[in-house]
Amino acid sequence: MQVVLLERVEKLGQMGDVVKVKDGFARNFLLPRKKALRATKANIERFEGQRAQLEARNLELKKEAEQVHTKVHGQSFIILRQAGETGILYGSVSTRDIATAMTDGGFTAARNQVVLDKPIKTIGLHDVRIVLHPEVSATIAINVARTQEEAERQAAGEDLTQRRDDEEEEAVEAAEFFESEELAPGDEEEEAAGEEEDAKE
């Protein structure tokens, strides 16, 4: 399906571009969200007639987004979750969770503004991109921890996941050391028998 874009769409084009997309993408995303119109002759003429108005509105929204960017970019938000000893979460942190954390922190955000390259399934600090406008994005840090105290330690630069890995590695090394120092089953009998033979000689 060919559509005319009503705003910039990442990896697709700029406002006014006529592009070809898959029917499902157009019907399920672009058209219902008013990001594009079917590229019919009537719709293209309609767009051109409103282009100046749309560009002015887009510029206004972009300026507002840039103002929000100066406030939210680089901010950190804490999300507390249950996790195992190795830091793996019982579940994951969703875009809705992140939007809620931002709202609780005083910033208005919708879940569809949150971009996750992959699900957050471990404790730690995770960089997340927030789309404030088709041409303006901000990066925030999501501090996922089991407790407030852990969140503060992570914010101070401590890697609790790495610390757990180091502790486990040290425990394994210690166990292997003591095992190597102990005699295997039957070694004591063999050693005693050898001493008896030496005594007879």
Curated annotation (Swiss-Prot):
GO cellular component: ribonucleoprotein complex; ribosome
Disordered: region residues: 150-201
Residue ranges with Basic and acidic residues bias: 150-165
Acidic residues bias: start-end ranges: 166-201
GO molecular function: rRNA binding; structural constituent of ribosome
Entries under InterPro entries matching the protein: Ribosomal_bL9, Ribosomal_bL9/RNase_H1_N, Ribosomal_bL9_bac/chp, Ribosomal_bL9_C, Ribosomal_bL9_C_sf, Ribosomal_bL9_N, Ribosomal_bL9_N_sf
UniProtKB keywords: Ribonucleoprotein, Ribosomal protein, RNA-binding, rRNA-binding
SUPFAM superfamilies according to UniProt: L9 N-domain-like, Ribosomal protein L9 C-domain
Record GO biological process: translation
Coiled-coil spans in chain: none
PANTHER family linked: 50S RIBOSOMAL PROTEIN L9 (PTHR21368)
Its job: Binds to the 23S rRNA.
HAMAP family noted in UniProt: Ribosomal_bL9
The family this protein is said to belong to: Belongs to the bacterial ribosomal protein bL9 family.
Protein name per Swiss-Prot or TrEMBL: Large ribosomal subunit protein bL9
Organism: Parvibaculum lavamentivorans (strain DS-1 / DSM 13023 / NCIMB 13966)
Primary gene name: rplI
